[in-house]
């Protein structure tokens, strides 16, 4: 299976530059150093998968000309990875259907606490008009499939919490990682491509 991977953002939780025009060690003269929060898009002939819904989601989807997604995978519930969830409403309107979200039980529980309204059905008076984002939660652990794409999920140490890494075909996306356990190391061994963000 051949997939196209688009990096929608590779910035830190504050983006680059951070508010206050803080560029850190990045050279502001290089336009590539203007970075949105971390997220990627994975596409093959039949399926489009988004990993993480950053606060920059609207701009990221506009930049990549995305008009539909088949699923969103969530690595963890820090604000820089889920606070774009409300922007799914506009995809709901275009696609005329709910969006499937895949995450661990703990992540789904935390998203439901913070974004409870996105899991509620549309009212009958709406006549199918998506006046709010509508998401269907799918709990994951280990291997699962989205259409024809096989995905392996695994837990990663993110300091005071965990994040979920995803292996798709011979590629893995490991965001916000402090360290890997032996199980994760076995999963990411002998890949063609590893995208990793160590934090």
Give short role names for the model-derived ranges.
Residues 179-199:
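Cap/insert and terminal regions of metallo-dependent hydrolase folds
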